[in-house]
Amino acid sequence: MSVDAATVRKIAQLARIAVTDAEVPHLQGELNAMLAFVEQLSEVNVEGVEPMTSVTPMAMKKRQDVVTEGDIADDIVKNAPMTENNFFLVPKVVE
C-alpha cells in the first residue's frame, strides 16, 4: 500500500494538523515507511509462538469479588463542574 499526497492532506485534516505543501512529501515518505514496516511484520512466521501481554512473566493479583451497596454517587460527582441529580452535565458539542 502506498500513501499519496492527497491521502497525507486528508489524514492531516482528520487529525486537525496544519500541514504545509512543503511538508507533504516528507510526511508521505514517513507514512510509506511505516506502512512498509507493518507489511514486513505481517510476513514474520509466528507459528508456534504463544501470545504474550508482557515481556516478563507475571500474574495479576486477584481480589475477592464482593458485592457492596455503592452509595458513592455523591463522592463521584462532587468534583464535577456541573451535575444534576448525580449525573454529569457537559456542554453541547453537536448542533
Swiss-Prot record:
MF-aspect GO terms: asparaginyl-tRNA synthase (glutamine-hydrolyzing) activity; ATP binding; glutaminyl-tRNA synthase (glutamine-hydrolyzing) activity
Signal peptide: none
UniProt record, GO biological process: glutaminyl-tRNAGln biosynthesis via transamidation; regulation of translational fidelity; translation
Catalytic activity: L-glutamyl-tRNA(Gln) + L-glutamine + ATP + H2O = L-glutaminyl-tRNA(Gln) + L-glutamate + ADP + phosphate + H(+); L-aspartyl-tRNA(Asn) + L-glutamine + ATP + H2O = L-asparaginyl-tRNA(Asn) + L-glutamate + ADP + phosphate + 2 H(+)
Lineage: superkingdom: Bacteria
Entry EC number(s): 6.3.5.-
One Pfam family recorded for the sequence: GatC
InterPro entries: Asp/Glu-ADT_sf_sub_c, GatC
Keyword annotations from UniProtKB, A to Z: ATP-binding, Ligase, Nucleotide-binding, Protein biosynthesis
Top-rank EC class of the record's enzyme: ligase
SUPFAM superfamilies linked to this entry: Glu-tRNAGln amidotransferase C subunit
Disulphide bridges: none
Role this protein plays: Allows the formation of correctly charged Asn-tRNA(Asn) or Gln-tRNA(Gln) through the transamidation of misacylated Asp-tRNA(Asn) or Glu-tRNA(Gln) in organisms which lack either or both of asparaginyl-tRNA or glutaminyl-tRNA synthetases. The reaction takes place in the presence of glutamine and ATP through an activated phospho-Asp-tRNA(Asn) or phospho-Glu-tRNA(Gln).
Family from the record: Belongs to the GatC family.
NCBIfam families: gatC (TIGR00135)
The protein's assembly and partners: Heterotrimer of A, B and C subunits.
Name of this protein: Aspartyl/glutamyl-tRNA(Asn/Gln) amidotransferase subunit C
Organism annotation: Bradyrhizobium sp. (strain ORS 278)
Gene behind the chain: gatC
